[in-house]
Amino acid sequence: MSLTITSSVTHPELKDLSTVRNEQKELNISPVHDVNVTKATATFGMGCFWGAESLYGATRGVLRTTVGYAGGSSDLPTYRKMGDHTEVLEIDYDPTVISFKELLDLFWNNHEYGLTTPIKRQYASLILYHDEEQKQVAHASKLEEQERRAPEIITTEIASKENFYPAEAYHQKYRLQGHKDLASSLNLSPKLLQTSYVATKLNGYLAGVGGIEQFKAEAETMGLTPTQRQYCYYHVEQNEGQGLYC
């Protein structure tokens, strides 16, 4: 179904979820939680992982994001007992749409605490490569960035990705979870909060990343009903350009 979305004068509500359920049944629409394409994975630490997850979620070619803990040696870290791990974002992406180098370009330019200021391990700047090609691209990219920023010294660590521990459910898709009725209408289990395609995209767009025109272009891929899309349109438009925050 093709839908022309127009801005609403009043704040759209999703309190009555029966409207969404009826649309899903009548239009044979369901939220798209998985996209069947060949994926590659990248893992970055760049400060608070809430903002990073929104940034990459609304990026074209990104299919899934999960926040978690990695880069250390302690077992089973949690937010309250992180040990020597760092807050990181794991990204599944379509390499035919966006490259690892392009993901790195976003990485270098969107650190919450900057690249040249030493910071505690929790918020460290970190690239965890998944294969030899990523290792080479990461080191070359860091060298280019260091030359660009000289005489400042980039503190980013590059290491092999070993264990990754998903963060607690309340950290996953944090901006989307702030829209409780919308999140409920998407049938998101704790596992789907980590893996869902539509949750990944909306977590970025609802935070103001990507913009309204890009949202319109991608909305068809998400399995949203007219009511869900109208709600999202309003909030994407309201939040566009606000900038990332934690």
Curated annotation (Swiss-Prot):
Induction annotation: By ecdysone.
A cellular-component GO term for this protein: mitochondrion
Gene: MsrA
Family note: Belongs to the MsrA Met sulfoxide reductase family.
Name of the protein this chain belongs to: Peptide methionine sulfoxide reductase
Post-translational modification comment from the UniProt entry: Conjugated to URM1, a ubiquitin-like protein.
Disulfide bonds: 48-246
Phenotype upon changing residue 246 to S: No effect on methionine sulfoxide reductase activity and still lacks methionine oxidase activity
Source organism of the structure: Drosophila melanogaster (Fruit fly)
Biological role: Has an important function as a repair enzyme for proteins that have been inactivated by oxidation. Catalyzes the reduction of methionine sulfoxide in proteins to methionine. Does not catalyze the reverse reaction involving the oxidation of methionine residues.
